[in-house]
Amino acid sequence: MIDTVVARRYANAIFALGKKDGDDALSSRGECLAALGEALAAAPGLDMTLKSPVIGVEEKKAVLDKLLGKLKADQTMRSFCFLLADKERLAFLREISAWYGKLLDEAKGIVRGELVTAVKLSADKKAKLKESLEKKTGTALELTFAVDKDILGGMVLKMGDRVLDASLRAQLGILRETFKRGE
């Protein structure tokens, strides 16, 4: 719980700075934070180094400086990451990245979701389905596609805290309940 509060607070702070600097800064900082999060996920040793209380702040800053140099981070991002090091908050970097991504999506009007189907869809069908869903919802969608043979047919769309279940499994479940009640 406290992890979430800390991560959200720092994500809000760097996002507010990005808003002042313009849309390009918002996007580039989002990309930088996402790349940092991916680097930490891909290299557990790096993640452990930045989280370790045994390693000094200056050593952590040196590692961050090299990493941020490779990512071509602007001075504000560098200062932000160094502040996290000074405040012993580098352990929250991945969570900060995730929260920043949510804030950025919200600012751009993008809704992320998952579309589950019973069979694998072609790229053309995915594009048409995405376009149709965007028209119906009135928002820009970023969808990930998954296959679950257990739904038998149809689809299940998960967007945020909403679930639209248009699967054959759900329809059969409704039919079963109707028969049980004797309607």
From Swiss-Prot:
Belongs to the ATPase delta chain family. Keywords: ATP synthesis, Cell inner membrane, Cell membrane, CF(1), Hydrogen ion transport, Ion transport, Membrane, Transport. GO terms for molecular function: proton-transporting ATP synthase activity, rotational mechanism. Its main location: membrane. F(1)F(0) ATP synthase produces ATP from ADP in the presence of a proton or sodium gradient. F-type ATPases consist of two structural domains, F(1) containing the extramembraneous catalytic core and F(0) containing the membrane proton channel, linked together by a central stalk and a peripheral stalk. During catalysis, ATP synthesis in the catalytic domain of F(1) is coupled via a rotary mechanism of the central stalk subunits to proton translocation. This protein is part of the stalk that links CF(0) to CF(1). It either transmits conformational changes from CF(0) to CF(1) or is implicated in proton conduction. The keyword Ion transport applies. Pfam families: OSCP. This is ATP synthase subunit delta. Gene3D superfamilies: N-terminal domain of the delta subunit of the F1F0-ATP synthase (1.10.520.20). It is a peripheral membrane protein. GO terms for cellular component: plasma membrane; proton-transporting ATP synthase complex. PROSITE patterns: ATPASE_DELTA (PS00389). F-type ATPases have 2 components, F(1) - the catalytic core - and F(0) - the membrane proton channel. F(1) has five subunits: alpha(3), beta(3), gamma(1), delta(1), epsilon(1). F(0) has three main subunits: a(1), b(2) and c(10-14). The alpha and beta chains form an alternating ring which encloses part of the gamma chain. F(1) is attached to F(0) by a central stalk formed by the gamma and epsilon chains, while a peripheral stalk is formed by the delta and b chains. It is found in: Cell inner membrane.
